[in-house]
């Protein structure tokens, strides 16, 4: 039965859903990597698709930008459609010195300036972490494909245009790999509902060094990450 934000039918989604922020990126993934593709939802142009990858059922759906948006879609996928595994796929801005453009960053944990997980956990700090089995599978797949990978803590920011740029130096000191806007929220929802979640990111820019990928390199890096994510999805 459709939810307020997803007009798919029961059984339309696979147990594993790959989730980019951009719904057009979800469309690109479905058309480029999946076979026997069916579009299953389009409310608010937040497109979702289900198909097969190497013969196994996989879904892909956009989640929008920021923790409030992604939390709605992840909650409804798990609670209403029985999704078991959420794999966020996106980009991040690096802050640590050893993280380079085109690296793949896998979020073992996710710090945040958002209060959503404290609200969820009665005012206490909640350690927003990835599912270990998903994490291990993704790391092994990246290494098998010789994709440069960094594993560790990311930071999910509420503000894209931060008024406190000095925070990035503090992040670097504390070993944060890079900054996104969703991982901590997705990990919190998954934990709350008993599902598994992972975040896999490409490094599109380095915040402290002012480096940015060209559009061509950005696409290549995304495709490399997608192969890691898809192999993870069918090997868990």
From Swiss-Prot:
Annotated catalytic residues: 205
GO terms, molecular function: purine-nucleoside phosphorylase activity
Transferase in keyword set: yes
Function: Catalyzes the reversible phosphorolytic breakdown of the N-glycosidic bond in the beta-(deoxy)ribonucleoside molecules, with the formation of the corresponding free purine bases and pentose-1-phosphate.
Keyword Transferase among record annotations: yes
Cellular component GO terms, alphabetical: cytosol
Record-annotated site: Important for catalytic activity: 218
InterPro entries tied to this protein: DeoD-type, Nucleoside_phosphorylase_CS, Nucleoside_phosphorylase_d, Nucleoside_phosphorylase_sf
Catalytic reaction equation(s): a purine D-ribonucleoside + phosphate = a purine nucleobase + alpha-D-ribose 1-phosphate; a purine 2'-deoxy-D-ribonucleoside + phosphate = a purine nucleobase + 2-deoxy-alpha-D-ribose 1-phosphate
Protein name (record): Purine nucleoside phosphorylase DeoD-type 2
EC number annotated for this UniProt entry: 2.4.2.1
Sites where the protein binds phosphate: 21, 25, 44, 88-91
Coiled coil: none
GO biological process, one term: purine nucleoside catabolic process
Record family assignment: Belongs to the PNP/UDP phosphorylase family.
Keywords: Glycosyltransferase, Transferase
Subunit structure comment from the entry: Homohexamer; trimer of homodimers.
NCBIfam families the UniProt entry points to: deoD (TIGR00107), PRK05819.1 (NF004489), PRK13374.1 (NF009914)
UniProt source species: Vibrio cholerae serotype O1 (strain ATCC 39315 / El Tor Inaba N16961)
Positions with a binding annotation for a purine D-ribonucleoside: 5, 180-182, 204-205
